[in-house]
UniProtKB/Swiss-Prot annotation:
Residues bound to Mn(2+) 1: D11, D347, H348
Pfam families: Metalloenzyme
Assigned keywords, A-Z: Cytoplasm, Isomerase, Manganese, Metal-binding
Record's cofactor remark: Binds 2 manganese ions.
Highest taxon in the source lineage: Bacteria
Reaction(s) catalysed by this chain's protein: 2-deoxy-alpha-D-ribose 1-phosphate = 2-deoxy-D-ribose 5-phosphate; alpha-D-ribose 1-phosphate = D-ribose 5-phosphate
Gene symbol of the encoding locus: deoB
Keyword Cytoplasm in annotation: yes
Protein name: Phosphopentomutase
Amino acid sequence: MQKRVVILLLDSFGIGASEDARDFGDLGANTLGNIAKACFNNLADSNDRNGALKLPYLESLGLGLSALKATNELPLGFESKPNLIGAYAYAQELSSAKDTISGHWEMMGAPVLFEWGYFKDKNNSFPKEILDEIMRKTKIKGYLGNCHASGTEIIKDLGEKHLETLYPIFYTSADSVFQIVAHEEKFGLDNLYALCEEAFQILEPLKIARVIARPFIGANREDFKRTAHRKDYAIKPHKKLLFEKFIEEKQGEVISIGKIADIYAHVGITQKFKAGSLMELCDVTLEQIKNAKNNSLIFTNFVHFDSDYGHRRDISGYANALEYFDARLKEVLENLRENDLLILCADHGCDPSFKGTDHTREYIPVLFYHKDLQPAFLGKSESFADIGQSIAYFLGLSPLDYGKNLLNFKGQS
């Protein structure tokens, strides 16, 4: 029987500080729990939403129960006995970091057990010899930034100077990343991409996981805004991914929606679809669920939870986006085929109530739905790789090097 897998990854949707959170300075972080608490206490009310966090479809798949198992606390406003239709687990990250690439790679069978390179200095973050080499190879006359920053704030602070000089803005964060900001029209999108490609080649030996192009538009700080033409340049995964096994062993289709292809350096991806907003990501995902052939894996990263609300520490915005996603999840469930396996998960936390603006080291929810899957708690996963191993089992692929299968279908012992 031909099968399909649909993975919906809510970027940054952690469910509580993991057992090693202290090592990352993240004790007390709980993305879901703290959003739910704020909503329950009417501290996340806005023109768009109010009251307790309402996620009935995620709850039916086991979200609240997964959080309860992870933290011993049910998120405020959630049901202790929901109408459960899914099987659920929670997962601890094995990888040595709390970034997007580490989380995504691990769940597809390539945990990051080495240390990425980082730029730890808050100011003058990048080594002079690196900056000099970038200038020499790209012929840019100068640069701005060279610091740790919030991506939206640095555009406000330096965007006008960038328009005067056309010097690109360089910045980083606690992640293994080198980000380049430039005006999409005045500097040029192709010029920005070319600059990022050169920078990536220079930085790859330092094990910098990603160089990210961050284009923006607008005439002054009041109307500057990022565009949908972000592009990530990532190091290639160091181990064979589930995607590659699926293509080699079953001639499967691997469909990337959003930034998935960039995260995996386009390894094992057969089709790519971009989308600019949360609504567009939902629309494209539903279109593929309706139209993709059997023997396909559809994988969407819903980046806006992280980029628009987690990093910006916007509790109300995060809650509103979750409620919008939950309403669209109803459509997903209605359009699944007879033998589709649906998985909802995350890659790390980014608690909008927590100090700073960085990711948070948290457990992630792992929620499964299939018509023949018994609703039940599947336990704690010691690695996100259990997700990939479970998919390999479902699709009849050879096992991955990491992870264990979590799935037990009706009729199986």
